[in-house]
Amino acid sequence: MAVSVGINGFGRIGRLAFRAMADKDIQVVGINDIVEPKILAHLLKWDSVHGPFPGTVSADTDALVVNGKRIPVSAERDPAKIPWKQWGARIVVESTGLFTAREKAKAHLAAGAERVIISAPAEDPDVTLVLGVNDAAYDPAKHFIVSNASCTTN
């Protein structure tokens, strides 16, 4: 069964996370970014470092369409108002760089997500993990807000 993920912030890190999840058993069920979907589609499709996205990418007024799959896009500035529950997002990748404090990241949980992965150093997460260093320390029973240490570390 695929894990359902939402992405808050579809800038460089959000798009790279999307690319990394595209060929895994992970389903991106929603994206939140203040930029209109047409521009997000262009940025996903054409990457000057990693090359073009290996699939089809287009946009509707409120969604990206990637390889024929429609992914809703919202433009909420308040994470508590992003429809994660409605979209079925169990995990949210927080990649805006704005919601790195626990109190701010908790808004994603209030909106229906079960877990938040912060792509930047966080002030007070449940745990900070670096893949290959301490990722075995992850405890799903008590770690709901996880810091990825730094988007340039992993």
Give the location of each predicted region.
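N-terminal Rossmann-like NAD(P) cofactor-binding subdomain of oxidoreductases
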Residues: 1-154
